[in-house]
Amino acid sequence: MADIEDFRRLIAGDHGLVVVSTLRDNGTIASSVVNAGVLPHPLTGETVVGMVFRGGIRKLGHLRKRPYANVVIRAGWLWAAAEGRTDLAGPDDPMDGIDAERLRLLLREIFTAAGGTHDDFDTYDRVMREERRTAVFVHPERVYANPGQ
């Protein structure tokens, strides 16, 4: 049986690129490609899949109404999926215990957990603030992978 460490091992395979799927209002699936990493939840310490979404996108609306997502990562023919309930923390989605400074650092933590690097984190922070970026956490209630893993 797969676990979140199987998911984590694939992050370096393609810069943390994943396909994240949510449910639209009409029950159909909405999928897109984003970067994700595995890290401790900022409040509970639980190991979660973290992503950063630009403020105002439809996917955030989906997660506000139906807080559940599926995230699939792959490297070559190896893949793993994590699915579960979601939490949001951002300027439009306040989370108790996460103030503006903690959010700034949290967005960096997710970025680096996804394999990201940056030469100018002041600029990174400014862009994240201007775009009203939101941290998205998927609690891996179910993790599965291909048999070759």
Describe the predicted segments one by one.
Residues 10-11, 63, 110, 138:
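A generic structural signal for nonpolar/aromatic side chains embedded in well-ordered alpha-helices
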Residues 13-14, 65-66, 130-132:
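Structured helix-beta-strand junction loops
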